[in-house]
């Protein structure tokens, strides 16, 4: 039977070269307050949703044109578009799952001719008082490290006989990887996988990911990650 792979990719710091969400608040928010909020999030003192609400409150009198110019100045990984083509060619469904915001993801994807990519994220609008107003359509209180519950998107978009691949780099991915068969990690996510002894493949760009997936696809026998299967089963039972 032909192997079916479902690919799930983080956005900030994985597709984009910088964490755009964090960079926006560091540039336009109150620096001291922003630093304090991020420290609390990384030390699990507040949830992802609480951090986003506080970060948005730290920004006053935002200039929309300045924000757009700033977003436009941040590049994506130059190998990502080729990776998207690779997934299409090999009929592997690709989902972008981000704890960031649709406001800048839409802008980046339009710029890079990637508007057809399916993605899930939090929502962000600029109101009449030039304030950032976030909303969280995919919030799950079990997913405290991500206001957009990435775990649920993975479980809802993959079946028992399909292999799940996750590609990410950061804090919002820590809970997510526990439910995936194959993990590509860098930066903070890589450190987390090492500490928690979760098997992963290190990567620097999507060309390296492509080469490894080719290897996985060529294996005659490919095992799903047992601990991930147990975790997924727990979710089904608890529901």
Question: What does each of the following model-derived ranges do?
Answer:
Residues 2-112, 116-121:
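Alpha-helical substrate-recognition element adjacent to the catalytic core
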Residues 79-93, 100-239:
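C-terminal cap/substrate-recognition subdomain and adjoining C-terminal extension
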């Amino acid at each position: 039977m032909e192997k079916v792979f479902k690919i799930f990719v983080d956005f900030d710091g994985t597709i984009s070269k910088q964490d755009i969400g964090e960079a926006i608040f560091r540039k336009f928010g109150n620096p001291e307050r922003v630093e304090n909020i991020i420290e609390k999030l990384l030390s699990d003192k507040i949830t992802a949703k609480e951090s986003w609400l506080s970060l948005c409150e730290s920004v006053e009198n935002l200039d929309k044109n300045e924000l757009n110019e700033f977003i436009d100045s941040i590049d994506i990984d130059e190998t990502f578009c080729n990776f998207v083509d690779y997934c299409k060619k090999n009929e592997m469904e690709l989902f972008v799952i981000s704890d960031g915001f649709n406001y800048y993801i839409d802008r980046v994807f339009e710029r890079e001719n990637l508007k057809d990519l399916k993605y899930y994220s939090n929502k962000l609008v600029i109101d009449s008082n030039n304030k950032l107003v976030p909303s969280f359509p995919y919030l799950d209180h079990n997913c405290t490290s991500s206001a957009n519950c990435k775990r649920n998107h993975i479980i809802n978009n993959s079946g028992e006989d399909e292999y799940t691949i996750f590609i990410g780099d950061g804090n919002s991915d820590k809970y997510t990887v526990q439910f995936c068969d194959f993990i590509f990690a860098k930066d903070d996510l890589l450190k987390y996988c090492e500490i928690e002894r979760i098997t992963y493949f290190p990567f620097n760009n999507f060309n390296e990911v492509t080469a490894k997936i080719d290897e996985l696809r060529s294996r005659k026998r490919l095992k799903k990650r047992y601990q991930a299967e147990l975790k997924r089963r727990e979710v089904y039972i608890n529901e």
